[in-house]
Amino acid sequence: MNVNEIIKGPILTEKSYQLMSSGVYSFKVSPKTNRSETKKAVEYIFNVKVEKVNIFTVPKKEKKLGKSKGFTTKYKKALVKLMPGYTINLFEDESPQDQKDSETVSENTEEKAKIAKKKAELEAKNKEIAEKLAKKQAELAKKESETNENQEKKIENQTENQENSAK
């Protein structure tokens, strides 16, 4: 039997996750296979050393959906115990994604820090500009008041001169 045809796929249940921590992995295998073929297939596909293989057939079970009754298909299940120090990464697609996620999280925190720093710098510049504007406005207001006073004095002087010349 071809090595790729022996293992149909992993069985991922709550119990199988608990067994994975102790180095036991569960697979759905071809009904025609035996222990030695399963051992060779796991060692070849996952590049690990297998200590022990247990195989058993899971019988069909009756299922009801509404009024209709049916059966699940029976299948062969293999529990494969690996030698100490070996593991199988069943989630190869997710591990690089997890690394990417952690990298993006660290990049996001760095970007947030940069943004916060730029924001603080901009706020400081805005404060300086606001102070300069306030000073200039105060100077302009002072000059305006001085020019208004000077104009008032000129007008008073002109009116006094006109009054004096009229007398």
From Swiss-Prot:
Pfam families: Ribosomal_L23. The keyword Ribonucleoprotein applies. Residues 1-118 are annotated as: Large ribosomal subunit protein uL23. The keyword rRNA processing does not apply. One of its GO terms (molecular function) is structural constituent of ribosome. Keywords: Ribonucleoprotein, Ribosomal protein, RNA-binding, rRNA-binding. Residues 91-112, 137-167 are annotated as: Disordered. GO terms for biological process: translation. Residues 158-167 have a biased composition (Polar residues). Residues 119-167 are annotated as: Unknown. GO terms for cellular component: ribonucleoprotein complex; ribosome. Disulfide bonds: none annotated. InterPro entries: Nucleotide-bd_a/b_plait_sf (IPR012677), Ribosomal_uL23-like (IPR013025), Ribosomal_uL23/eL15/eS24_sf (IPR012678). Residues 97-112, 137-157 have a biased composition (Basic and acidic residues). Belongs to the universal ribosomal protein uL23 family. One of the early assembly proteins it binds 23S rRNA. One of the proteins that surrounds the polypeptide exit tunnel on the outside of the ribosome. Forms the main docking site for trigger factor binding to the ribosome. Part of the 50S ribosomal subunit. Contacts protein L29, and trigger factor when it is bound to the ribosome. This is Large ribosomal subunit protein uL23. It comes from Mesomycoplasma hyopneumoniae (strain 232). The lineage of its organism: Bacteria, Bacillati, Mycoplasmatota, Mycoplasmoidales, Metamycoplasmataceae.
